[in-house]
Amino acid sequence: MRFKGLDLNLLVVLDALLTERTLTAAASSINLSQPAMSAAVARLRDYFNDELFTTSGRERVLTPRAETLAPAVRSALLQIQCSIISWDPFNPAQSDRRFRIILSDFATLVFFEKVVERVAREAPAVSFELLPIDDDPDELLRRGDVDFLIFPELFMSSAHPRAALFDETLVCVGCSTNKQLPRQLTFERYMSMRHVAVKFGRTLKPSIEEQFFLEHGLKRRVEIVVQAFSMIPPMVSGTARIATMPFRLVQHFKKTFPLRIIELPLPLPTFTEAVQWPALHNSDPASIWLREILLQEASRMTSPGDAKRRPRQP
């Protein structure tokens, strides 16, 4: 079918090409043979009067025209899928759907493992691809390349729907065998001690406490930067270093590392961990099903305050 001289089937080819960046991968993703893919690319180049991509070493680099077309083509195809082509009925017990989710190791360890356990019971063929924090998660959502983001609500954009999951508190942690670690920290002592800090992605996006320091013009002494919360305990253990971490995660790691919580001498805010999904997936039955599970499992979590007040077992 043609629309204003363009074979609309070529939009699918163009989207695959712009996404995969190689002819072989693009052809495979839409089940086309290599000759058919090459012929389709030639027709696209003729229609747009543009090469669309050039070769640089082993990479194919998109032309400026192709870079401009990429988001528009993906958006058009997603809109067709969500508004015109009805979503397939979803039966959890029979589905083999694979969900792609961006989340931190914090969310994985204190929350998502319960979700995985439940899904394994209710939908044994459903699978997950858990991805690290990306430099541009909003773009991945817009393109429909991921199904969900799970991280602090304050870092989420307003372009897509979201729902709050649970609140979390930040605490200061040090090694329990460090005899020089005080029971209470002054602000000056906290800022001058050697810190382990976590930053995310290739661009080293700041964590919540780092964002707080930046907004208030504060600078602490960061000795080690890691890219996951799970890397903090071994960097603190057996040293005089301290770190600032989510309370639930400290409780998790106290089972295997000699950690001690010290009260923070500054008012770091409590944050809300939330889930966000592409706006175009609002009516996707599979997405709705998993969103309900996420919210239900989050509602069963004990609040950090309750955990702090819980009496120790003799």
Swiss-Prot record:
DNA-binding region: 23-42
HTH lysR-type domain: residues covered: 6-63
Pfam families found in the cross-reference section: HTH_1, LysR_substrate
CDD domains for the chain: PBP2_NodD
Protein origin, superkingdom: Bacteria
This protein's record includes keyword Transcription: yes
Alphabetical list of InterPro entries matching this protein: LysR-type_TF, LysR_subst-bd, NodD_PBP2, Tscrpt_reg_HTH_LysR, WH-like_DNA-bd_sf, WH_DNA-bd_sf
Keywords linked to the UniProt accession: Activator, DNA-binding, Nodulation, Repressor, Transcription, Transcription regulation
GO molecular function: DNA binding; DNA-binding transcription factor activity
Family membership: Belongs to the LysR transcriptional regulatory family.
Cited function: NodD regulates the expression of the nodABCFE genes which encode other nodulation proteins. NodD is also a negative regulator of its own expression. Binds flavenoids as inducers.
Record protein name field: Nodulation protein D 1
Origin species: Mesorhizobium japonicum (strain LMG 29417 / CECT 9101 / MAFF 303099)
